[in-house]
């Protein structure tokens, strides 16, 4: 079930990323690490999304890198799918940890739109920070990274101006961690929209790694605000006061929620007297200062 949620998130993100990247640049690269995991199911899903972009591709170069322990069977299978005939694919075996950075260099992935997907949740070891950081050579650059339960995403933040993580959980025990790093604020907003728009799969819920109460949240277009409320109050306890704009940015970058969710929570907190606002009346605009009473 968690694999299905990850795959749907990847597909949704690719559907938004690929046309925008092809509109921006003549060369675009998508790099899929651990591509032989789960018999290449997520690699095939990604390839099908990219192949649908052939309308955009005329006169442009869209390349998919498949990197893993032994990706030849996956690459051969994908090569036999007629719909994928126009997609340029390069398969690199020998291990994601060992070959990912090398494959990016060989594909001249510097200063071109670059998205990497690394599902290391079932790998024997998580990728090194250097392997993930190799993607920052792109411009703009993005990464979707899945980690096994209990593995922290903190070591991977370096090099990414914007970085967020969400736990995919089925119960009280720690779940897989899905991290997203990007150089684009607009892309982070798009990822958050996709996060809450995926189909609700029975038993799979989100947990915000920053929520001290480890509250499980149903996947919904209107997510339960409890964890965000706690995180905003804790943040205000640390910083003293912040503008609405700063708190919207905090929600977007430091929690699993969207900026719009923060606006709704701030209205509720202000109306209940849990926070004070300056000025005390009028619209809750971006420059209104929020603090604890």
Where do the language-model regions lie?
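Residue-level recognition of the N-termini of beta-strands and the immediately preceding loop/turn
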Residues: 25-29, 59-64, 87-89, 114
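S-adenosyl-L-methionine
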Residues: 1-57, 70-112, 245, 256-275, 279, ...
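Flexible, charged surface loops at secondary-structure boundaries
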Residues: 22-26, 57-59, 107-111, 137
């Amino acid at each position: 079930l968690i694999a299905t949620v990850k795959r749907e998130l990847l597909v949704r993100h690719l559907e938004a990323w690929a046309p925008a990247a092809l509109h921006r640049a003549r060369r675009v690269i998508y790099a899929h690490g651990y591509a032989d995991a789960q018999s290449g199911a997520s690699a095939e899903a990604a390839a099908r999304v990219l192949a649908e972009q052939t309308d955009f591709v005329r006169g442009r170069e869209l390349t998919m890198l498949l990197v893993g322990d032994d990706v030849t069977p996956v690459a051969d299978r994908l090569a036999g799918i007629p719909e994928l005939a126009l997609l340029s694919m390069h398969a690199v075996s020998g291990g994601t940890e060992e070959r990912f950075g090398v494959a990016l260099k060989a594909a001249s992935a510097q200063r071109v739109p670059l998205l990497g997907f690394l599902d290391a949740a079932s790998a024997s070891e998580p990728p090194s920070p250097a392997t993930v950081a190799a993607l920052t050579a792109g411009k703009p650059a993005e990464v979707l990274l899945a980690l096994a339960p209990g593995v922290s995403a903190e070591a991977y933040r370096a090099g990414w101006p914007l970085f967020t993580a969400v736990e995919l959980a089925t119960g009280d025990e720690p779940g897989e961690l899905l991290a997203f790093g990007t150089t684009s604020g607009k892309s982070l907003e798009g990822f958050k929209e996709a996060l809450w728009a995926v189909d609700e799969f029975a038993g799979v819920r989100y947990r915000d790694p920053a929520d001290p109460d480890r509250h499980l949240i149903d996947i919904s277009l209107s997510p339960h605000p409890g964890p965000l409320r706690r995180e905003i109050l804790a943040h205000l306890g640390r910083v003293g006061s912040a503008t609405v704009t700063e708190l919207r940015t905090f929600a977007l970058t430091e929690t699993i929620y969207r900026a719009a969710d923060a606006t709704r929570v701030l209205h509720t907190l202000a109306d209940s007297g849990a926070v004070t606002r300056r000025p005390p009346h009028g619209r809750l605009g971006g420059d209104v200062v929020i603090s604890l009473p």
